[in-house]
């Protein structure tokens, strides 16, 4: 009798995705982040669910309900901090996952890559709306500044902003709808992640060499299940060190002050994982231009497969492209630093240069370098 694992309609899906999946024998630890993102998503949904049981999405009680969770609910403090720092771990894994895709040419799977970009946008939207919920100073002013950017859209901008706000400013209606969206979006992310995986399994995984590996596949279980468990343990360790020793390390002290529409904080800035995009937004003096640059900073990833001029898929054997890739990483770190600095000299100029360099590397230098490398190999 054939194993039920391979015949039952439900277990068959799990079997073909996580057990008998043919996997390249040489994928490195950089391929761990997909499973880690799945774990992060499950963790965020579970902790978020327990937080939602005690949270109230009303401007008068939102801030005190979060304080109540931390002070009075059994283990509420650890659930709250696991959720807040879990978001940071989520984005660390996301950035490393996208970076892996860029380095090893995983973007040559167009469906998987494009759904990945949609996932990135959706997760960013979810995180932004989640940051508004505690209704601290940075929550309120962050929501005001970012939603206000939509007013830069010609003709319909102002109406659009007021429609999103549910009034003439960020208020009770805004908070309630942000809570509703923040609750539903992770489930949409889960569905998109399933589609992401579906398309990946149509082609099979890429590998560090970028060479087709059909002739050398091994089963996912036990080889990569055990490898993923190691990754999960390291992720859990990092998260719990953060939660138990310095839970507010990545947060903003201003968010411990209740939201006050009459008092603007001296420096309005988003969470650390949005700072690179925020720096690109601020480096353009024109409002509409800034908004376009902000969207394009992520959307530029969709153009990367079209600009792949190399005869090789991966950067493993392309030292010049490797140098450019690490220059891009350094540039993104610079942008992240600039995003957290006040808008004054020399930070403005550094931010503008870093923003120009970001788009130049991805759109101009990488395709040209790939052509140069092809010629060096006499191809």
Swiss-Prot record:
Primary location class: mitochondrion
Gene Ontology terms describing biological process: mitochondrial electron transport, ubiquinol to cytochrome c
Keywords: Electron transport, Heme, Iron, Membrane, Metal-binding, Mitochondrion, Mitochondrion inner membrane, Respiratory chain, Transmembrane, Transmembrane helix, Transport, Ubiquinone
Membrane topology value: Multi-pass membrane protein
Membrane spanning stretches: 33-53, 77-98, 113-133, 178-198, 226-246, 288-308, 320-340, 347-367
GO cellular component: mitochondrial inner membrane; respiratory chain complex III
Amino acids binding heme b b562: 83, 182
Molecular functions per Gene Ontology: metal ion binding; ubiquinol-cytochrome-c reductase activity
Record's cofactor remark: Binds 2 heme b groups non-covalently.
Residues given in the record as a ubiquinone binding sites: 201
Domain of life: Eukaryota
Cellular compartment(s): Mitochondrion inner membrane
InterPro entries documented for this protein: Cyt_b/b6_C, Cyt_b/b6_C_sf, Cyt_b/b6_N, Cytb/b6-like_sf, Cytochrome_b, Cytochrome_b_C_euk/bac, Cytochrome_b_N_euk/bac, Di-haem_cyt_TM
UniProt xrefs under CDD domains: cytochrome_b_C, Cytochrome_b_N
Cofactor section: heme b
Positions annotated to bind heme b b566: 97, 196
Keyword Lipid metabolism: no
Keyword flag Transmembrane: yes
SUPFAM superfamilies: a domain/subunit of cytochrome bc1 complex (Ubiquinol-cytochrome c reductase), Transmembrane di-heme cytochromes
Family, similarity comment: Belongs to the cytochrome b family.
Note in the entry: Heme 1 (or BL or b562) is low-potential and absorbs at about 562 nm, and heme 2 (or BH or b566) is high-potential and absorbs at about 566 nm.
Function: Component of the ubiquinol-cytochrome c reductase complex (complex III or cytochrome b-c1 complex) that is part of the mitochondrial respiratory chain. The b-c1 complex mediates electron transfer from ubiquinol to cytochrome c. Contributes to the generation of a proton gradient across the mitochondrial membrane that is then used for ATP synthesis.
Quaternary structure and partners: The cytochrome bc1 complex contains 11 subunits: 3 respiratory subunits (MT-CYB, CYC1 and UQCRFS1), 2 core proteins (UQCRC1 and UQCRC2) and 6 low-molecular weight proteins (UQCRH/QCR6, UQCRB/QCR7, UQCRQ/QCR8, UQCR10/QCR9, UQCR11/QCR10 and a cleavage product of UQCRFS1). This cytochrome bc1 complex then forms a dimer.
Protein name (record): Cytochrome b
Species name: Galictis vittata (Grison)
């Amino acid at each position: 009798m054939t194993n039920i694992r391979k015949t039952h309609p439900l277990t068959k899906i799990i079997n073909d995705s996580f057990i008998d999946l043919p996997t390249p024998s040489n994928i490195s630890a950089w391929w761990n982040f997909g499973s880690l993102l799945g774990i992060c998503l499950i963790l965020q949904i579970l902790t978020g669910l327990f937080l939602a049981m005690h949270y109230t999405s009303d401007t008068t009680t939102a801030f005190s309900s979060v304080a109540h969770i931390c002070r009075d609910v059994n283990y509420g403090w650890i659930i709250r901090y696991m959720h807040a720092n879990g978001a940071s771990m989520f984005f660390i894994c996301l950035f490393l996952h996208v970076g892996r895709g860029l380095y090893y040419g995983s973007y040559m799977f167009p469906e998987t890559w494009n759904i990945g970009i949609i996932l990135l946008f959706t997760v960013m939207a979810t995180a932004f709306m989640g940051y508004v919920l505690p209704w601290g100073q940075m929550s309120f002013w962050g929501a005001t500044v970012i939603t206000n950017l939509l007013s830069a859209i010609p003709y319909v901008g102002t109406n659009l902003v007021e429609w999103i706000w549910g009034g003439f400013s960020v208020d009770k209606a805004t908070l309630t709808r942000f809570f509703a969206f923040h609750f539903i979006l992770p489930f949409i992310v889960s569905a998109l992640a399933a589609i992401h995986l579906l398309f990946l399994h149509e082609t099979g995984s890429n590998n560090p060499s970028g060479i087709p590996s059909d002739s050398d596949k091994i089963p996912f279980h036990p080889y990569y299940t055990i490898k993923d468990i190691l990754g999960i343990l390291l992720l859990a360790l990092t998260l719990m060190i953060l939660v138990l020793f310095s839970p507010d390390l990545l947060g903003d002290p201003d968010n411990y002050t209740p939201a006050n529409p009459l008092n603007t904080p001296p420096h309005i800035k988003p969470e650390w994982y949005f700072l690179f995009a925020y720096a690109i937004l601020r480096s353009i003096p024109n409002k509409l231009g800034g908004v376009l640059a902000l969207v394009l900073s992520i959307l530029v990833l969709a153009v990367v497969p079209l600009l792949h001029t190399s005869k090789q898929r991966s950067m493993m054997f392309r030292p010049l492209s490797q140098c450019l890739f690490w220059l891009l990483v350094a540039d993104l770190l610079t942008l992240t630093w600039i995003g957290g600095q006040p808008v004054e000299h020399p930070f403005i100029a550094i931010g503008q240069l870093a923003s120009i360099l970001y788009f130049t590397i991805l759109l101009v230098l990488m395709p040209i370098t790939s052509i140069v490398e092809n010629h060096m190999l006499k191809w």
